[in-house]
Regions:
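Rhodanese-like catalytic fold shared by cysteine-dependent sulfurtransferases
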Residues: 2-5, 19-43, 52-85, 96-157
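Bacterial N-terminal signal peptides
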Residues: 7-15
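Structural scaffold elements adjacent to functional motifs in cytosolic proteins
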Residues: 45-47
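Short, surface-exposed ligand- or partner-binding patches at beta-edge/loop junctions that are enriched
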Residues: 89
Length: 157
């Protein structure tokens, strides 16, 4: 009798959370898996942060369309071919999930960086600014970002 009661409770509780099994239509990837996915040149890299955030550093080859702007969907459809996979990132992963949902709804195949640009940095992945690779110390944004070609100037001889 006790087993039946417990099983009833478990069944009832599991029915309260159907969204856990719901397909969101896009894939959320770790920084390592995202890096592998965007190595494919057919994948379009989309950074959905603000223009200011993007200018401070971004993933190589990314284009910037701010998801918080009212014309995001219009700019996305005018810029992004539906025949390509779109790899979306933002700062922490929240805006990229929102953008991924919007893009998926209008017919795009989408992957998104689950941990966002912060996770990308923490994983020690390459970051670019003004077309040049930059180095961020300790995997975190520093007040002063040092370009890789300037590191020798910092070495005490």
């Amino acid at each position: 009798m006790k087993k039946i009661f417990i099983m009833s409770i478990i069944t009832m509780l599991s029915s309260l959370f159907p969204c856990q099994a719901q397909n969101k239509g896009y894939k959320s990837l770790s920084a390592d898996d995202y890096e592998k996915a965007i190595a494919d040149t057919a994948v379009i890299r989309l950074d959905v942060r603000t223009a200011e955030e993007f200018a401070n550093g971004h993933i190589r080859g990314a284009i910037n369309i701010d998801v918080l702007k009212s014309d995001f969907e219009q700019k996305a459809t005018a810029t992004l071919p539906k025949s390509k996979t779109i790899a979306v990132n933002c700062r922490s992963g929240k805006r990229s999930k929102n953008a991924a949902a919007i893009l998926t709804k209008i017919g795009y195949q989408v992957i998104e960086l689950d941990s966002g640009f912060n996770g990308w940095q923490a994983a020690g992945k390459e970051i670019y600014r003004d077309g040049k690779k930059i180095l961020i110390l300790d995997g975190k944004a520093q007040p002063k970002i040092i370009r890789e070609d300037k590191l020798n100037d910092l070495i005490i001889k």
